[in-house]
Amino acid sequence: MFVIIGWAVSMACIFGVFIAHGGNISVILHALPWEMITIFGAAIGAFLANNQMKVVKATGRGLGLCFKGSKYSKARYMELLALMYDILQKARKEGLMSIEKDVEDPHSSPLFQKYPTVGNDHHVTEFITDYLRMMVSGNLNAHEIESLMDSEIETHHQEEHAAVAALQRLAGGLPAFGIVAAVLGVVNTMGSVGQPPAVLGGMIGSALVGTFLGILLAYGFAEPLAGLLEQKVEDAGKEFQCIKTTLLASMQGYAPQVAIEFGRKVLFSGDRPSFSELEGHVKKK
């Protein structure tokens, strides 16, 4: 929603001021279709040549996320931490083996079904159950599991950030393709040098639209989307860090209510529930 609003504000300011100062918008509209095909088509072709198919697909998914509201909120994190509390509390009271069935089949587990917002998220559920399974097996100590968690989180970050980098490269190339379109327009204009000045002026104006569009598409559209997607990637990584910190605190002997406090402190301040909010939510559940 805010992406559309941001674009609308940018376009209104740019073209509104241009028209207010007596600019002829018809010149831009006349040149727009062919210049867009040249610039955008060349940029998409370069994008496909520059990225593996998995990155292209990840970029497509990422662009879809940019037009949706963030799923990461205080309410989601309270559910996540309440789930972690229930799991760790059960393991503390009944032993680690008591959560084995929950770990092996989380979709049928009453614990995970109790918190559908988190329990229905495949990536989060898999991350939690993978490391709970290692804790149940008892083959790895806290330092070894922490190292493994760090490696997985880093891999996840690299995979998600590949789409961000691809969009940033696309944004970097758009002004250059705008110049290419402008140069081609100038070449056409030079072939018509015998035309009256009014005709030549229109042709030169159309050629300059290419440079304008390249810069506008880069810094008005592609670069903001890359920045927004990067923020969403950071939000996703923060959730995994919260899980990691909570589980490691539990492995180091802290009680469940203290372990989830470790996890709470990792969250960004805007999404972090207060101590009393989390305590009340856990007790209510």
Where are these regions (language model features)?
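Hydrophobic faces of alpha-helical transmembrane segments in multi-pass integral membrane proteins
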Residues: 5, 9-13, 33, 37, ...
